[in-house]
Amino acid sequence: MNIYLVGGAVRDQLLHLPVKDRDWLVVGSTPDELLSLGYLQVGKDFPVFIHPETHEEYALARTEKKSGSGYTGFICDFSPDITLEDDLIRRDLTINAIAQDKNGKLYDPYHGIEDLNNRLLRHISPSFEEDPLRVLRVARFAAKFYHLGFAIAPETLELMKKLSTQGELQHLTAERVWLETEKALMTENPEIYFQTLLKIDALPALMPELATISVENFQYAMTALKNAVSLIKNMDCNKSAVCFATIFLGIIYVNPSHMTQKQQEQDNHQKNITPCLFEKLKVPAYHKELAILAGKYHIYIHNAFNLKSHTIIDLFNKWDVWRKPQRFLELLIVCAAHYSAQSKNQPTYPQKSYLLGLYQKAMTIDVKNIVSAGFKKTEIRNELTRQRISAVEKIKNCYP
C-alpha cells in the first residue's frame, strides 16, 4: 500500500499558497484493509475513508468509465491493481494531477508542473468531456488563479465550448451549478468566471437571465462586481451574497438617465426574472433576501440625501436594520459598487457613510427609557419611531 498527497494541496503548495484541505490517494489497497486499520468509510459511489486520527479524506485509487449522460453516469473500478497514473489521468486539469509521496517526492506524469510554471489551465485527456461539471470547475479555477496570471489553454477552452454547444450542461443539477458558482464568487476575480461562461456560450443553459442582457449591461454588471470585491476586501461579511446581489442588480439595471421614466418597467422586469433566477440556481435564502432588497431599494439609497427623516426610519424598519445590521451594511456595499460603476467621475459613495451615521444615531434611542416613561403597547412603538425620526432629523440638519 502506498499513500500520496494529491490534488489541490500539492498544487497550492507548489504555488506557495496556503493549503486548506489535504486529500490523500491510496494505491494498492482494499476497503477491508483500510477498515482493519481503523479508517471510517464514508463514500457511497466509491470508497472514501476518514483517517482515525487526522480525520482527513483518503480515497482508493480508481478509474472511471462513462456509462450515461451528465456528471453522474460513471462506473468506478477501485481494485488494488489500479496504478497512480491510472487514477491521476481521470482528473480534470494537469495542475490537479500531481502527487507527492511521504518523502516529498513529486509524481507528475501529465506535466502539471510545467503548466503551473506557464500559468496554464489545461485538461489532461479527451475524457474531460465525459463530465460537464468540469466546465464550471475550470471557469472557477480561471477566476481563482487569475491574479496569478493563469489562463485557460486554447484547446481546453475549445473543448469547454463543445460541451456547452452539445447541451451537456443541461444535465447539471441546480445544486451543483450553485456550488461551483458560489465558490467562484468567493475568489478575487469572480467576474472571470462569468466572462468565461459567456465566452463558451454556457450562460443560456446555466443562467439565461444573465445571457439575455445586452453586452453593455453585462460589462456594467462585471464592473460593479469588481467594485464589490474591492469594497469588501478584508471585511468580515458574506462575500458570496454581496457578489450575487451585485450581479442580480446588474441584470435588472436601467440606465440612470432613464431611471425615473422606466422605474415601473424595471419593477415589472424584476418581478419576472426574480423567481426564475433564484429557482434556476437554488440560491440560499440570505442571498435571495439581499438581492431582492438591492433590486427594490437601490434607487432610494442612491437618493439618500433627498429622503425625509420619516422615510429613512420607515426604510430602516423595512430593511430590519435593528436586528440585521450586517445585512444593512452589505446592502449599502452592493449599492456603492453599482454607483461607482455608473458614475466613473465620482468613485466615492457618501450615501453609505451618511446612512450608517443616521442608523447609528437612531440606535442610541433606548426603548427601555420609553417604557420607563409610562408608554404602553402600541404607544411604545409609536414613541420609539418618533424619537428615532427626531434623532435622524438632527443629524440630517448637519448635512448641506
From Swiss-Prot:
Residues 217-322 form the HD domain. Gene3D superfamilies: Beta Polymerase, domain 2, cca-adding enzyme, domain 2. It is an enzyme of class 2 (transferase). This is CCA-adding enzyme. PANTHER family: MULTIFUNCTIONAL CCA PROTEIN. One of its GO terms (biological process) is RNA repair. Catalyzes the addition and repair of the essential 3'-terminal CCA sequence in tRNAs without using a nucleic acid template. Adds these three nucleotides in the order of C, C, and A to the tRNA nucleotide-73, using CTP and ATP as substrates and producing inorganic pyrophosphate. tRNA 3'-terminal CCA addition is required both for tRNA processing and repair. Also involved in tRNA surveillance by mediating tandem CCA addition to generate a CCACCA at the 3' terminus of unstable tRNAs. While stable tRNAs receive only 3'-terminal CCA, unstable tRNAs are marked with CCACCA and rapidly degraded. PROSITE patterns: HD. A single active site specifically recognizes both ATP and CTP and is responsible for their addition. ATP binds at G8, R11, R91, R137, R140. It comes from the Bacteria. Its EC number is 2.7.7.72. It catalyses: a tRNA precursor + 2 CTP + ATP = a tRNA with a 3' CCA end + 3 diphosphate; a tRNA with a 3' CCA end + 2 CTP + ATP = a tRNA with a 3' CCACCA end + 3 diphosphate. Keywords: ATP-binding, Magnesium, Metal-binding, Nucleotide-binding, Nucleotidyltransferase, RNA repair, RNA-binding, Transferase, tRNA processing. Signal peptide: none annotated. The gene is cca. One of its GO terms (molecular function) is magnesium ion binding. CTP binds at G8, R11, R91, R137, R140. Belongs to the tRNA nucleotidyltransferase/poly(A) polymerase family. Bacterial CCA-adding enzyme type 2 subfamily. Its cofactor is Mg(2+). Mg(2+) binds at D21, D23. InterPro entries: CCA_bact (IPR012006), HD_domain (IPR006674), NT_sf (IPR043519), PolA_pol_head_dom (IPR002646), PolyA_RNA-bd (IPR032828), tRNA_CCA-adding_enzyme (IPR050124). Pfam families: PolyA_pol, PolyA_pol_RNAbd. Coiled coil: none annotated.
